[in-house]
Amino acid sequence: MTTDIIVVGAHARTADTVLSTAARIAARLSAQLVVVWVDDSRVPADPVDGSGRGATVPLDPDEYDDVAVDTSAVETAAARLRTEVQITVDVRVLAGDPGKALARVAADTHAVMIVVGSSNGPAAGLKAALHGSTASFLMHHQLVPVLVVPVSKARP
């Protein structure tokens, strides 16, 4: 018997609500949670590979190449989920486009669901207008359910 997998997108500003929601669903389904942190300021050094793993280079050629990616917040959140919800949590750190990276991990792991947070903040609207939102990309390019967790504190 295989364990179902739920993929959740995370980044430095990911609301605890998104990770907690994904963890509660994983616990109810007795599923494993794969937390995917994607550095969209970097791209894979080998675009042919396209996995997002391994060597990466900055998207902006003027940036320093030796800047370490700080994933401590995601690792800390994953450790908290392991103890609070008592589920298996795997963390993957990738580079490139978040939507494509999440889709790739979901396909590679045969995930039953992808969980992402809604965009918020003043820059979110501009980013979505220029590049499209990760949630929208996933909803239009996935065969598995995509759950978009609202993260805005504002109520209508």
Predicted features, each with a name:
Residues 34-36, 90-94, 147-149:
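General small-molecule cofactor/ligand-binding pocket signal
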